[in-house]
Amino acid sequence: SCKRECSGSKRQK
């Protein structure tokens, strides 16, 4: 589960 930190490049859902 990714939050705002993973918005775009670091998308690790």
UniProtKB/Swiss-Prot annotation:
GO molecular function: toxin activity
Tissue: Expressed by the venom gland.
GO annotations of cellular component type: extracellular region
Subcellular localization: Secreted
Keyword Ribosomal protein on entry: no
Main location (coarse class): secreted
Keyword Secreted attributed: yes
Positions of transmembrane segments: none
Keyword annotations from UniProtKB, A to Z: Secreted, Toxin
Record-given protein name: Toxin OcyKTx3
